[in-house]
A protein has these predicted regions:
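Edge beta-strands of extracellular beta-sandwich domains
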Residues: 12-21, 289, 400-408
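Active-site glycine-centered loops adjacent to acidic/histidine catalytic or metal-binding residues
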Residues: 51, 91-92, 120-121, 200, ...
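N-terminal active-site segment of His-dependent metallophosphoesterases
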Residues: 8-9, 16, 21-102, 386
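Short acidic, glycine-rich surface-loop motifs adjacent to enzyme active sites
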Residues: 186-207
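Binuclear metal-dependent phosphoesterase catalytic core
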Residues: 246-332, 374-384, 389-404
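Extended active-site neighborhood of metal-dependent phosphoesterases/phosphodiesterases
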Residues: 8-9, 13, 21, 98-191, ...
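Aromatic sugar-binding surface patches on proteins
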Residues: 113, 346-380
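Conserved structural position at the C-terminal beta-strand
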Residues: 4-6, 394
Length: 408
């Protein structure tokens, strides 16, 4: 391919919902058509969704009736205010069933906002054992596997960090070609600029056995920039400050635990949904948008006696938490302090599996879909016996507070 780095304030025309900023190398010269899209350096909204990954009738139905309409609605809410909106799908658009690429392109087009794609391990042809060649079907429908574009004041870099071996086997990492390309591209990006780096597998994950190949080389290239990495692959949520200038949003799957039955949570307890980033004159703000909920749905509490292992404590789940957030509680109007963080199993997803086993005879034996036992975004406190009313106040990284109260 030959492609253009789409400048801020413009968008390439879409085919099947995805921007066509590229052309095949079969002519001596190429002309690229771009349309105005907002204002140069102006406001915009971006939605980052990970692991749509449908396989089977139920998964496609839920993706097309729950997830895509939600994305469309949020996108249209921004565009009704003359704020351009687009989305990024962070890989595993399908689940090895690549014959469904034409179908999912048709459904993506119905969202009616531009969708930039990222290639994931399940988007490779499992019958091909060569990394580059195994992406042939993806390229046919979506274009280059790595590229760049601009939006607002931000610079976007999209990477392919799946080293595919064939037959569903792969490693996660970067090759020489892409590292050299990133290094060359950054010569045109001023130091101090803000970058979004989008790739399927995360740069970091709290599972100590995980390692992205050549990740240090990649991160070293971003010295002098402000960087937010957007990734998926794990199907759970993990927001991490990797370096002083680099933060990663490893985003839980929009389908939760692989669209399991009628489930509405990932196996770590994150509701099915996606991240929304708003870019404007004051920089970047973000929130997690749960499907079927408004933007203020950012935490959930569990009364005393409802969480195994914490029976005498009030517990709170804050799925989009990072180290800039605060989780505080009040007793009868008096601030008591911050709640303590703990790692544990999500009571919602765990009870969902229990309920399905008891009432419908469904026994989840697949190890990969069992509840995550070390999700880190839970908080607890032991209220005083005399407290009558408890208020929980969660403050996000942007300084916005969310409140819920309960009788004790």
């Amino acid at each position: 391919f030959i492609y253009v780095v789409t400048p801020s304030g413009y968008m390439a025309p879409c085919n099947g919902g995805t921007p066509v900023f590229y052309k095949t190398l079969n002519e001596n010269s190429h002309d690229f058509q771009l349309h105005r899209w907002g204002t140069v350096g102006g406001k915009y909204a971006m939605m980052a969704a990970a692991d749509t990954q449908p396989r089977g009738e139920n998964a496609f139905h839920r993706l097309e009736t729950e997830a895509f309409p939600d994305l469309k609605q949020v996108g249209f809410e921004y565009m009704s205010q003359n704020i351009p909106a687009f989305a990024i799908f962070l890989g595993d658009i399908l689940w090895d069933n690549l014959e469904m690429f034409p179908h999912i392109k048709q459904e993506i087009a119905k969202i009616q906002i531009p969708i930039y794609p990222v290639i994931g391990n399940h988007d490779h042809d499992k019958e091909v054992s060569d990394d580059d060649a195994s992406a042939h079907l993806y390229r046919h429908f979506f274009g280059p596997t790595y590229y760049a574009f601009n939006a607002g004041k931000d610079y976007y870099i999209v990477l392919d960090n799946i080293l595919y071996k064939g037959n569903k086997k792969y490693e996660v990492g970067l090759n020489d070609q892409q590292l050299n390309w990133v290094k060359s591209y950054l010569q045109y990006v001023p130091k101090g600029a803000h970058l979004f780096v989008c790739m399927h597998a995360p740069a970091y994950f709290y599972n100590e056995n995980y390692k992205l190949g050549r990740v240090a080389e990649l991160l070293d290239l971003f010295e002098g920039y402000k960087v937010d990495i957007l990734s998926g692959h794990t199907h759970v949520q993990c927001n991490t400050q990797i370096r002083n200038n680099i933060r990663e949003y490893n985003i839980a799957s929009i389908g939760g635990a692989w669209w399991l039955w009628d489930g509405i949570y990932s196996k770590d307890g994150t509701p099915i949904g996606y991240q929304v980033f708003e870019s404007g004159k004051n920089g970047i703000a973000n929130y997690f948008k749960s499907l079927g909920h408004d933007r203020d749905y950012q935490f959930r509490y569990y009364p005393v006696g409802t969480v195994p292992g914490h029976e005498d404590e009030l517990c709170v789940k804050v799925w989009n938490w990072d180290n800039r957030w605060k989780v505080e509680y009040y007793e009868d109007g008096k601030l008591k302090g911050e709640m303590k963080q703990y790692k544990g199993m999500d009571p919602d997803y765990d009870f969902f599996l229990q309920r399905k086993a008891v009432t419908e005879g469904k026994d989840m034996k697949e190890r990969g879909r069992q509840a995550n036992k070390n999700a880190y975004f839970f908080f607890s406190t032991k209220p005083s016996d005399k407290a009558k009313k408890i208020k929980i106040v969660v403050t996000d990284a942007n300084g916005k507070s969310y409140e819920q109260s309960l009788e004790h």
